[in-house]
């Protein structure tokens, strides 16, 4: 397949590496246009992939079979809209990012839209991307009109396993959102690795109760206890990890809070549900952000 990967950060480089190794024709797409992108990745087994790949070639984009978007949630909408007119109208766009809310911003996109969520973990260490842990990627249609692209899951399964297709991806996205609503803001506020959160079961339960109430009103059956058990499982499995939000805070970057707890707040408001704990966490992270964005270092640029 011919694939353009939009966003060449940790997750983007992970996919570029895996696609390249499987013989797919790939290019990166960067915010600052340049003819190549450097991919420098250390795999979970210690092997190294270090290549310069094509980037920002509009002819390549115009003949791509898939646009894989691995940007931060707040960058997605503007970036995808800027490329949509060059991309064939039949080429699916697969979004893989933390949080929810980008689909609502892309309702008028003509191309088929797919949403994904992944438990693969990768982080930056200087100029190198470390593939910290293998995981599973869930993908499915973002809107009712987006149809069956399960063949893509089969192809991507051979690239970076595991990949699972869901006709109803929304339920999976909400489960991941519950995890993100707990782990991301708490680690960002307390400046700690994920594993430290084990010591705060009451706080975690409080957040899960609020998230479960919203999920139920969204039409997906769950319980606060189920969400809590799942969150604790993820905390244990990723105990050593530094969450993406804490990485953003430490490097004075704009976080994805608007698409995590912020998205939950918007849906809660729509259903008339009070979510005081999530509101408090949202405001605390926004306050941290504003401390450095006020002096201009972490201002959200266009993607």
From Swiss-Prot:
GO terms for molecular function: 2-dehydropantoate 2-reductase activity; NADP binding. The keyword Oxidoreductase applies. Transmembrane segments: none annotated. Its main location: cytoplasm. The active site is at 176 (proton donor). Substrate binds at residues 98, 180, 184, 194, 244. SUPFAM superfamilies: 6-phosphogluconate dehydrogenase C-terminal domain-like (SSF48179), NAD(P)-binding Rossmann-fold domains (SSF51735). InterPro entries: 6-PGluconate_DH-like_C_sf, 6PGD_dom2, ApbA, Ketopantoate_reductase, KPA_reductase, KPR_N, NAD(P)-bd_dom_sf. Pathway: Cofactor biosynthesis; (R)-pantothenate biosynthesis; (R)-pantoate from 3-methyl-2-oxobutanoate: step 2/2. Disulfide bonds: none annotated. One of its GO terms (biological process) is pantothenate biosynthetic process. It comes from the Bacteria. Its EC number is 1.1.1.169. It is found in: Cytoplasm. It catalyses: (R)-pantoate + NADP(+) = 2-dehydropantoate + NADPH + H(+). It is an enzyme of class 1 (oxidoreductase). NADP(+) binds at residues 7-12, 98, 122, 256. Keywords: Cytoplasm, NADP, Oxidoreductase, Pantothenate biosynthesis. Belongs to the ketopantoate reductase family. Catalyzes the NADPH-dependent reduction of ketopantoate into pantoic acid. This is 2-dehydropantoate 2-reductase. It comes from Escherichia coli O157:H7. The lineage of its organism: Bacteria, Pseudomonadati, Pseudomonadota, Gammaproteobacteria, Enterobacterales.
């Amino acid at each position: 397949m011919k694939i353009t990967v939009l966003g060449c950060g940790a997750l983007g480089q992970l996919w570029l590496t895996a696609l390249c190794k499987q013989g797919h024709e790939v290019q990166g797409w960067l915010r600052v246009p340049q003819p190549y992108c450097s991919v420098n990745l250390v795999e979970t087994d210690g092997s190294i992939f270090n290549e310069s790949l094509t980037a920002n070639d509009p002819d390549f984009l115009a003949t791509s079979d898939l646009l894989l978007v691995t940007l931060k949630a707040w960058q997605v909408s503007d970036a995808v809209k800027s490329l949509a007119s060059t991309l064939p109208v039949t080429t699916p766009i697969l979004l893989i990012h933390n949080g929810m809310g980008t689909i609502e911003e892309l309702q008028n996109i003509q191309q088929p839209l797919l949403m994904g969520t992944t438990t693969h973990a990768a982080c930056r260490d200087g100029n190198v991307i470390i593939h910290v842990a293998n995981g599973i990627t869930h993908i499915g249609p973002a809107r009712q009109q987006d149809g069956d692209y399960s063949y893509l899951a089969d192809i991507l399964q051979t690239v970076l396993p595991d990949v699972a297709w869901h006709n109803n991806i929304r339920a999976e996205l909400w489960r991941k959102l519950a995890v993100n609503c707990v782990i991301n803001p708490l680690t960002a506020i307390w400046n700690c690795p994920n594993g430290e959160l084990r010591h705060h079961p009451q706080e975690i339960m409080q957040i899960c109760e609020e998230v479960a109430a919203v999920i139920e009103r969204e039409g997906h059956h769950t319980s606060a206890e189920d969400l809590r058990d799942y969150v604790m499982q993820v905390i244990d499995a990723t105990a050593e990890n530094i969450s993406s939000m804490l990485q953003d805070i430490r490097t004075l970057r704009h976080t994805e809070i608007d698409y995590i707890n912020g998205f939950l707040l918007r849906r809660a408001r729509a259903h008339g549900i009070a979510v005081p704990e999530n509101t408090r966490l949202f405001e605390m992270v926004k306050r941290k952000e504003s401390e450095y964005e006020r002096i201009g270092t972490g201002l959200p640029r266009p993607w």
